[in-house]
C-alpha cells in the first residue's frame, strides 16, 4: 500500500482543523488476550512439537501411513515405549552438521554483503527499508537471501559432482537426529527473544506485553529484535536457515530415491521444481517481503522462532519425504496437469504481488491491465502521533479479490500434494494446513487493516467484497 506524497498532507491537516479526529492505527498483535486465543496458544505450545514428531515418525517407522501408529497402539501391537525406542536419538554427528549449517548461514547473512543487485537486472538486494512499525520507525535491512541461497546451492552441487565431502543424502540420513537439533535452536531462540524483550529490547516502543507469559512467549513481545545494527531475528529466521534449506532437503530426498530405487520419479522432480520456484521467488522478492504481514504484523516469539526452525523445514517438505518411502510415477497427462496447476497458481501469486508492488512504487502512476489503476485513499496515525497516507488498489487482481495472491499460493500447494497421488493422507497435510493458515491470515490481516485505517477500510471492502474466491468467499 504505497505511501502518498507529502502534498496530500495539507488535505489531512485540513480534516484535523475541521475537528475530524484522525484514526490512530493500533496495528500489530493484540495487547490483551481472550480465552480463545490463550487456549489456542496453549494447544500449539503443547502439541505442535508432537505433531511434527508424529509425521516424521510415521514415515520413518510406518511408510508414511498416518493411521498405522494409532491402530498399532489401539490393537496392542505396539506400546508408546516401542515407538520411542525405535526413534533415532540426537547424535554428535547430527549436531555438528546443524551447527555448521546455521553458522554458515549466519556468516552469509552478516559478513557477505549482497553484490547480485549490482549486475542482476530487476533484483533489489543490498540495504533496503522495511515498512513503518507501529511506533513509527522504518528499519533498514541487509537483503542478501538470494545470494546466500545461490552460494549454498553452488557448493551443494560442487560437492555432489566433484568434491564428495559428504553424501547428497546426508540430510535424509540424519533427518530425525536433526529434528532434535532444530528443536533446541527453536526453543533457545524463542526464550532468548523473550528475555531480550524484558531486559534489553531493541526498541521498547515497539514491544507489547500482555501480562500472560504463554501468549507473550509464543506470539512474541519485541516487534523487531536485533543484535547489533544488522542481525534482524525476523528476517534471518524467516528466510534462513529454513527456506534456504527447503530446496536442499528436497534434493537430499531425490538423491535418496536414486540410491534406493535406481531412479528419480517424475513426481519427485515435479515436487523439486515447483517448490524450488516458490523458494527462489521468495528470495528474489525478499525486499518486497519486508512489507508483508510477517514483518509488518507479527512480533518475534516462539511462533516464528520455533516455527521457522522446525515446523517449516519438517512439514513443508512432507511431499518429498513421502516420495522417498512411496515412489510415485505419474502418467504423462497427470504430470502435465499437476505442472500446469502449479505454474498457473504461481502466475496468479506472482502477478498479484507484482501489481501491488508496482502500484506502491509508482504511487499509482502506472498501468494495470492496460489502465490506470483505481484506488481508495486512506490515512492512519502511528504511535508517535504522526499522520500518514496510503492508497488501497481496487484494480487488476486486487479488484477481483482482496487476497488473490493467497488463492494462487493455495493452487501451488495443492499441486505439490497431487504429485504424490491419493494412496495416503500425509502429503495432503500441507494443503490443509496452508488453507487454514491463509484463511486465518486473511482475517488477521483485515483486522489489522481495519484497526489501522478505520472507516477507510470499510470503503475498501465495499469496493472489493470477496477475500479469496470471487462469488464464494
Swiss-Prot record:
UniProt-annotated location(s): Endoplasmic reticulum membrane
Enzyme Commission number: 1.3.1.21
Catalyzed reactions per annotation: cholesterol + NADP(+) = 7-dehydrocholesterol + NADPH + H(+); 7-dehydrodesmosterol + NADPH + H(+) = desmosterol + NADP(+)
GO molecular function: 7-dehydrocholesterol reductase activity; NADP binding
Positions annotated to bind NADP(+): 356, 360, 393, 398, 405-406, 445, 449-453, 460
A Gene Ontology term for the protein's cellular component: endoplasmic reticulum membrane
Membrane-protein topology: Multi-pass membrane protein
GO annotation (BP), single: cholesterol biosynthetic process
Region (Disordered): 1-20
Transmembrane residue ranges: 36-56, 97-117, 175-195, 264-284, 304-324, 329-349, 419-439
PROSITE patterns hit by this protein: STEROL_REDUCT_1, STEROL_REDUCT_2
Enzyme class (EC, first level): oxidoreductase
Pfam families hit by this protein: ERG4_ERG24
UniProtKB keywords: Cholesterol biosynthesis, Cholesterol metabolism, Endoplasmic reticulum, Lipid biosynthesis, Lipid metabolism, Membrane, NADP, Oxidoreductase, Steroid biosynthesis, Steroid metabolism, Sterol biosynthesis, Sterol metabolism, Transmembrane, Transmembrane helix
Functional pathway: Steroid biosynthesis; cholesterol biosynthesis
Family: Belongs to the ERG4/ERG24 family.
Function: Catalyzes the last step of the cholesterol synthesis pathway, which transforms cholesta-5,7-dien-3beta-ol (7-dehydrocholesterol,7-DHC) into cholesterol by reducing the C7-C8 double bond of its sterol core. Can also metabolize cholesta-5,7,24-trien-3beta-ol (7-dehydrodemosterol, 7-DHD) to desmosterol, which is then metabolized by the Delta(24)-sterol reductase (DHCR24) to cholesterol.
Official protein name in the record: 7-dehydrocholesterol reductase
Organism: Xenopus tropicalis (Western clawed frog)
Amino acid at each position: 500500500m504505497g505511501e502518498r506524497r507529502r502534498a496530500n498532507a495539507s488535505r489531512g491537516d485540513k480534516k484535523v482543523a475541521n475537528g475530524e479526529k484522525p484514526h490512530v492505527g493500533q496495528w500489530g498483535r493484540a495487547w490483551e488476550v481472550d480465552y480463545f486465543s490463550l487456549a489456542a496458544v496453549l494447544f500449539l505450545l503443547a502439541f505442535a512439537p508432537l505433531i511434527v514428531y508424529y509425521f516424521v515418525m510415521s514415515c520413518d517407522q510406518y511408510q508414511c501411513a498416518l493411521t498405522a501408529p494409532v491402530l498399532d497402539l489401539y490393537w496392542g501391537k505396539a506400546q508408546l515405549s516401542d515407538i520411542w525406542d525405535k526413534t533415532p536419538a540426537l547424535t554428535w554427528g547430527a549436531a555438528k552438521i546443524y551447527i555448521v549449517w546455521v553458522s554458515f548461514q549466519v556468516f552469509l547473512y552478516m559478513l557477505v554483503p549482497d553484490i547480485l543487485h549490482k549486475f542482476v537486472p530487476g533484483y533489489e538486494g543490498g540495504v533496503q527499508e522495511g515498512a513503518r512499525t507501529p511506533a513509527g520507525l522504518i528499519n533498514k535491512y541487509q537483503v542478501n537471501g538470494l545470494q546466500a541461497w545461490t552460494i549454498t546451492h553452488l557448493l551443494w552441487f560442487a560437492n555432489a559432482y566433484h568434491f564428495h565431502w559428504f553424501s547428497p543424502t546426508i540430510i535424509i540420513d540424519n533427518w530425525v537426529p536433526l529434528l532434535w537439533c532444530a528443536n533446541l535452536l527453536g526453543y533457545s531462540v524463542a526464550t532468548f527473544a523473550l528475555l531480550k524483550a524484558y531486559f534489553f529490547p531493541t526498541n521498547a516502543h515497539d514491544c507489547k506485553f500482555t501480562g500472560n507469559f504463554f501468549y507473550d512467549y509464543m506470539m512474541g513481545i519485541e516487534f523487531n529484535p536485533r543484535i547489533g545494527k544488522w542481525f534482524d531475528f525476523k528476517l534471518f529466521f524467516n528466510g534462513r536457515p529454513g527456506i534456504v534449506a527447503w530446496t536442499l532437503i528436497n534434493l537430499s530426498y531425490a538423491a535418496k530415491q536414486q540410491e534406493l530405487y535406481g531412479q528419480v520419479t517424475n513426481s519427485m522432480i515435479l515436487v523439486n521444481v515447483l517448490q524450488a520456484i516458490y523458494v527462489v521467488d521468495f528470495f528474489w522478492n525478499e525486499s518486497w517481503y519486508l512489507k508483508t504481514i510477517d514483518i509488518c504484523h507479527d512480533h518475534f516469539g516462539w511462533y516464528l522462532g520455533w516455527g521457522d526452525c522446525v515446523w517449516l523445514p519438517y512439514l513443508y517438505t512432507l511431499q518429498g519425504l513421502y516420495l522417498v518411502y512411496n515412489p510415485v510415477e505419474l502418467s504423462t497427462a497427470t504430470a502435465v496437469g499437476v505442472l500446469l496447476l502449479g505454474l498457473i497458481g504461481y502466475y496468479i501469486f506472482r502477478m498479484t504481488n507484482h501489481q501491488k508492488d508496482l502500484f506502491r512504487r509508482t504511487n499509482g502512476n502506472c498501468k494495470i491491465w492496460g489502465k490506470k489503476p483505481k484506488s481508495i485513499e486512506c490515512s492512519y496515525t502511528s504511535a508517535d502521533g504522526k499522520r500518514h497516507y496510503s492508497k488501497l488498489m481496487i484494480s487488476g487482481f486486487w479488484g477481483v479479490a482482496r487476497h488473490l495472491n493467497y488463492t494462487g499460493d493455495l493452487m501451488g500447494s495443492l499441486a505439490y500434494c497431487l504429485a504424490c497421488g491419493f494412496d495416503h493422507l500425509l502429503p495432503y497435510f500441507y494443503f490443509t494446513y496452508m488453507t487454514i493458515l491463509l484463511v486465518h491470515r486473511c482475517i488477521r490481516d483485515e483486522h489489522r487493516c481495519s484497526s489501522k485505517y478505520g472507516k477507510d477500510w470499510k470503503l475498501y471492502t465495499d469496493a472489493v467484497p470477496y477475500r479469496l474466491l470471487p462469488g464464494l468467499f
